[in-house]
């Protein structure tokens, strides 16, 4: 894996959709990143209930969604690990692979939740935090500097594209027989249909 300014966008991606992709591209362009790693989580520690689709299905959908963007790379780094997908571990592994200029892309609501994350101080040592505004997420971050004094120097706030699309809604729409086209790439729609996901 070549070095350079690298964005990290992790998540369940259950399924991946245009909201994820638009944020990744916005951050890539604004911060002049060499690439963005899309990292599907095997299991998100702070998301109870887990994912609906299997890790293999979510990885496949992410690959299909990113296939036409040469700056996006889908990584198996968390899918292949048996343990929960702790960001601190992932960033450390990427650092050991020579990626030393990392930009962790989070919704601004997730930035507010950082004090609950495992080894958050190590995360801040290993990566810049890119907080992206999302629809319906009016978040006050002023209290965070008291809990995480190093955060202000590592935080980049971006007013990202506000596409009000959620994976939860897409799963519900599929279950109800409603269309999801134009909310996620056609290849992902076809994959969901072909594999009977979310029914």
Swiss-Prot record:
Pfam families: CTP_transf_like. One of its GO terms (biological process) is NAD biosynthetic process. One of its GO terms (molecular function) is ATP binding. SUPFAM superfamilies: Nucleotidylyl transferase (SSF52374). It catalyses: nicotinate beta-D-ribonucleotide + ATP + H(+) = deamido-NAD(+) + diphosphate. Keywords: ATP-binding, NAD, Nucleotide-binding, Nucleotidyltransferase, Pyridine nucleotide biosynthesis, Transferase. It comes from the Bacteria. Disulfide bonds: none annotated. Pathway: Cofactor biosynthesis; NAD(+) biosynthesis; deamido-NAD(+) from nicotinate D-ribonucleotide: step 1/1. Its EC number is 2.7.7.18. Catalyzes the reversible adenylation of nicotinate mononucleotide (NaMN) to nicotinic acid adenine dinucleotide (NaAD). Belongs to the NadD family. This is Probable nicotinate-nucleotide adenylyltransferase. It comes from Roseiflexus castenholzii (strain DSM 13941 / HLO8). The lineage of its organism: Bacteria, Bacillati, Chloroflexota, Chloroflexia, Chloroflexales. The gene is nadD.
